[in-house]
Regions:
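N-terminal compositionally biased, intrinsically disordered segments and leader/signal-like regions
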Residues: 5, 219, 228-235, 331, ...
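Bacterial Sec-dependent N-terminal signal peptides
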Residues: 1-12, 322-326, 367
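C-terminal outer-membrane/trafficking sorting elements
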Residues: 327-408
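Divalent cation-coordinating acidic motifs and surrounding scaffolds
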Residues: 10-321
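Short, solvent-exposed secondary-structure boundary motifs
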Residues: 293, 323-330
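Intrinsic disorder/low-complexity segments
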Residues: 3-6, 250, 265, 382
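Generic marker of residues within folded, mature protein domains
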Residues: 5-8, 89, 113, 131, ...
Length: 408
């Protein structure tokens, strides 16, 4: 397949999905966050999607690392616990979440897709472009963790989960840019759940951007896309057995292979830490058999000690022009009266011609706790009675506008 794009001003985005292995409750390896920090600092993703996140404290720790080591512009979506019925196992301690560079993406909304087991989490991101009002470009990022284990019963449970997603996506505009990242726990592209995702009759049809379809389980021909297990040694948590499965994926909608507004960068998809060495089959990634030129021993050590999965990475590109950062306009809006508030925050908008259609309130960890649509009125009374006491920042959706601080 040949993919070509015209030569315009281009912006590149780096994406990573990672199964965090019960973070932070899995403690067999001490100080695991240090190993994750090394991995994130090595790749420096613009969007970081995760599963097996146990709680909000783990999410906050990851956000702090991203802000300290990569960019203070990093934000996270609101952490939500699993809401699905969960009738087939106690998995309410395994959550999904997304982190993103707020100078490049604006979180427009987040939604939950319930299934019989675990939620799909849908995060609608908008490119922070100069023409985002007149011609917005949206990326729908969906993060998942399908039912694990082999056997026809588990295959059917995975299929039922994916069918719920298909139904949810049936209402999307057919030209939507959609990305599905997750631990699919599938053993072959012929498995019913995977076939459901790539069904050409669906409203949104997914593709494997690296085009490595096949029967992956214990098949050395696909060692380059294997993501589990990083380990053969027991006692570290998670699965052992060495590198012999492709469980982790980032799929894109078919239009992202060709559309110039937002598209997959050819040859950018990787199992991060996998040197595509056939000798690594069934070995742990620290083994000399797993050596190669792409990923050093130091990089592989960090991955080995943090999780039994390897992350999956890829890049997207756009031809739209992003807003230059930072060129702050501090007089665009202001807090009226004192910034010490109890129940109501009064805000005056001085300039609505700044590609802004919302205000966002963040806590000190950079998490969005409230969004406020902007109408025609220049004066807003914002109810903050539901917020906990503490320091907050309010910002226009246009990140060129300096955020304002208030205390509740």
């Amino acid at each position: 397949m040949m993919i070509t794009h015209s030569l315009f001003s281009q912006e590149n985005f780096k994406l990573m999905f990672y199964n965090l292995l019960n973070f932070p409750l899995e403690t067999n390896v001490p100080n695991r966050i240090d190993y994750l920090e090394q991995t994130l600092n090595t790749y420096k993703p613009d969007i970081f999607m995760v599963c097996e996140l146990n709680n909000v404290y783990g999410g906050n720790a990851i956000l702090q690392v991203l802000q300290d080591r990569i960019s203070e512009d990093y934000r996270s979506a609101v952490f939500t616990s699993n809401t699905s019925d969960d009738e087939i196992g106690n998995q309410n301690d395994l959550q999904n979440l997304i982190f993103y560079d707020n100078s490049k993406f604006i979180l427009e909304s987040q939604h939950i897709v319930q299934t019989l087991y675990r939620d799909f989490n849908h995060y609608k991101l908008k490119l922070n472009s100069v023409n985002q009002n007149s011609n917005p470009v949206y990326l729908n990022a969906i993060v998942c963790h399908l039912k694990a284990s082999s056997g026809s019963n588990n295959e059917n449970l995975r299929l039922q989960m994916v069918q719920d997603l298909t139904q949810y996506l049936s209402t999307f505009p057919s030209d939507s840019y959609v990305m599905l990242a997750g631990d699919f726990n599938v053993y072959s592209a012929s498995e019913p759940a995977f076939q459901e995702l790539i069904d050409p009759n669906n409203n949104i049809v997914f593709v494997d951007p690296v085009d490595r379809m096949g029967s992956w389980h214990t098949n050395v021909d696909y060692v380059d896309v294997f993501t589990q297990s990083t380990r053969t040694q027991t006692g570290l948590g998670g699965s052992t057995g060495g590198l012999d499965d492709r469980f982790d994926f980032i799929l894109t909608s078919t239009n992202m292979l060709s559309n110039q507004d937002l598209y997959y960068v050819p040859n950018s998809y990787q199992a991060f830490g996998n040197n595509s060495n056939p000798n690594c089959f069934n070995n742990e990634i620290l083994d000399t058999a797993c050596a190669g030129t792409s990923f050093s021993l130091e990089v592989r050590e960090a991955l080995y000690y943090f999780s039994d999965h390897l992350p999956v990475v890829m890049e997207l590109e756009t031809n739209v022009t992003l807003l230059s950062i930072p060129t702050y306009q501090t007089e665009s809006f202001q807090i009226m009266g004192t910034n010490m508030v109890d129940t109501t925050l009064e805000v005056q908008i001085h300039n609505q011609s700044l590609s802004s259609n919302k205000l966002y309130i963040f806590n000190t960890l950079g998490q969005v706790v409230k969004s406020i649509p902007l109408g025609t009125s220049n004066r807003l009374s914002i109810d903050v009675s539901g917020l906990k006491n503490g320091i907050y920042y309010i910002r226009m959706s246009n990140t060129n506008v300096q955020p304002l601080k208030f205390i509740k």
